[in-house]
Curated annotation (Swiss-Prot):
Top-rank lineage group of the source organism: Bacteria
Pfam families for the chain: LpxB
Reaction(s) catalysed (UniProt annotation): 2-N,3-O-bis[(3R)-3-hydroxytetradecanoyl]-alpha-D-glucosaminyl 1-phosphate + UDP-2-N,3-O-bis[(3R)-3-hydroxytetradecanoyl]-alpha-D-glucosamine = lipid A disaccharide (E. coli) + UDP + H(+); a lipid X + a UDP-2-N,3-O-bis[(3R)-3-hydroxyacyl]-alpha-D-glucosamine = a lipid A disaccharide + UDP + H(+)
Chain's role: Condensation of UDP-2,3-diacylglucosamine and 2,3-diacylglucosamine-1-phosphate to form lipid A disaccharide, a precursor of lipid A, a phosphorylated glycolipid that anchors the lipopolysaccharide to the outer membrane of the cell.
Entry's Gene Ontology cellular component terms: membrane
Lineage: Bacteria, Pseudomonadati, Pseudomonadota, Gammaproteobacteria, Enterobacterales
Protein name: Lipid-A-disaccharide synthase
Keywords tagged on the record: Glycosyltransferase, Lipid A biosynthesis, Lipid biosynthesis, Lipid metabolism, Transferase
Amino acid sequence: MTEQRPLTIALVAGETSGDILGAGLIRALKERVPNARFVGVAGPRMQAEGCEAWYEMEELAVMGIVEVLGRLRRLLHIRADLTTRFGELKPDVFVGIDAPDFNITLEGNLKKQGIKTIHYVSPSVWAWRQKRVFKIGRATDLVLAFLPFEKAFYDKYNVPCRFIGHTMADAMPLDPDKNGARDVLGIPHDAHCLALLPGSRGAEVEMLSADFLKTAQLLRQTYPDLEIVVPLVNAKRREQFERIKAEVAPDLSVHMLDGLGREAMVASDAALLASGTAALECMLAKCPMVVGYRMKPFTFWLAKRLVKTDYVSLPNLLAGRELVKELLQEECEPQKLAAALLPLLANGKTSHAMHDTFRELHQQIRCNADEQAAQAVLELAQ
């Protein structure tokens, strides 16, 4: 940044979640430095905020080993080209947003050229492949972390890291409107309500849906008024779930929803879900939950040896204890899942205590992440 040249920030986002984060960061930076310039790899939201897209984000948004191998030459070309062009541009700061397999190497290339680098969103190095922390430390001047235990992990290895809070915690109210959500979904205010979220990936839906449906059948024996909501991320997952339901529980009445996962969580007395970001969202929705997860036996055996944390769900990792029940592999079966959910549907002491802890954890990670990220970028640009 000089008198002649405006503040110049280079960014690379590789998927929709990164595009959303990038747009929020650009917005917060423009409020402080209206004439700043933003360039890089951007999706529609970042471009709408004024980011010049040298490449479209879709170029990087490939999933799965086969797809990555098929596009490898193109991905390597893009990374080499960005290394050259950013090297010539000399931005004040480079921000790699998530997409660690692409961005961390790029960050390292740029840092060698004297460009300051930030990695925005920590990979799960605290959970597995922990040695990646050394590569991240060499490649970046700063990591921006969503969660406090991530910063504690980086501190242990003397890698500069700033905890900025979680954007999802900023977006969701501390006290959600349960009856308002029920009105949206057509659920009576006085009914018991259970949300089933068997995951967003095909393999998860295939592995979990039957047990989740059988669990709901057991719970309806205790609560005949039980309303069951099943938000599904897209038409493919809905079709898959409908097929499994027709085989396992054809007579069980459920509300299948296209999207509306957040509304389903807010409306429900309890949720049964696969692990992942959904567990964090459910915590922020203040919906008591049970986590059920299954994977192929060899994958689970491998995961047990690679994963270095005591828990799989983010609420438990944040709390540092088993706040929500995690039933994995053989434990993830209808009788045990139903037994864990029953006290939550009773809306008694157990669910109230869980709700209060969820609220405390929400406050801990509600720190205005966009503003914090913008502040970190500007401090590094000085």
